[in-house]
């Protein structure tokens, strides 16, 4: 029996991926793995539980390797979407951001290896490229861990996608802007020159599924995306007001580093990035004493500085 496990499956991306999978084959096994009971219940109303063949819902912690392994039973594909994504939340709670985004990814990778999952894809972000924020740091380190997992599995092909912002996601700035527009309030913009990559939720889900099908072991895939001036988009909702930075951010995001350009190949509508080997991912995979490294926010901050320096040097 084949099936797909989606971590963070009750989130906006996970739900759209599930919709597309169900539309293609309503009888395939899809395991929605997340820790949000409310979101799972809401999703059940749209996509009912279908028994052995169909959607199944499992509550679980992303750091629980045993629970993940149980969830992967009868699955042959894994899509790892689960993450803490709010930049300000990650800055305020460095420990939890690292636990979920980094250690959670390590747990998923280990469960995939243990379960002999043939294909597994990680959903990364442009903020992992030359990171400046805690969120970017955790996603960048998770990328390294995921890709380096190929060194420790003969049966699983680990690959990743890396892209910008999704317009219709539940945590998109556009939801906040629409609320402010309805209230007649100014539209906050951090910097007049800031740009961001955007595309639709449907395109994001479709890209992940296609790369899961045809992607190659150890490759990071980035779509050809358009960058937009945020100030211009804000004008569609009301009067923009410049607020300044609340958290570490960049004026312009990029989908690969200058150094990665030498290892990046155009595939038409997307790019294949052959990542240079970094020590971080393999260090974690072979059993780094994570409890000592990530035992406090101070330790994590020191580690984050070393990681960012190593990726931007």
What are these regions (language model features)?
Residues 143-313:
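Strand-loop microenvironment adjacent to phosphate/nucleotide-handling motifs in alpha/beta enzyme folds
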Residues 25-39:
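Conserved glycine-rich Rossmann-like NAD(P)H-binding loop of the short-chain dehydrogenase/reductase
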Residues 57, 122, 160-162:
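Conserved beta-strand scaffold in the Rossmann-like NAD(H)/NADP(H)-binding core
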Residues 36, 126, 226:
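Residues in the short beta-alpha loop(s) of Rossmann-like NAD(P)-binding domains
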Residues 80, 84-143, 158:
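Conserved Rossmann-fold NAD(P)-dependent oxidoreductase catalytic core, especially the SDR/UDP-sugar
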Residues 4-24:
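N-terminal Rossmann NAD(P)H-binding glycine-rich loop of SDR-like oxidoreductase domains
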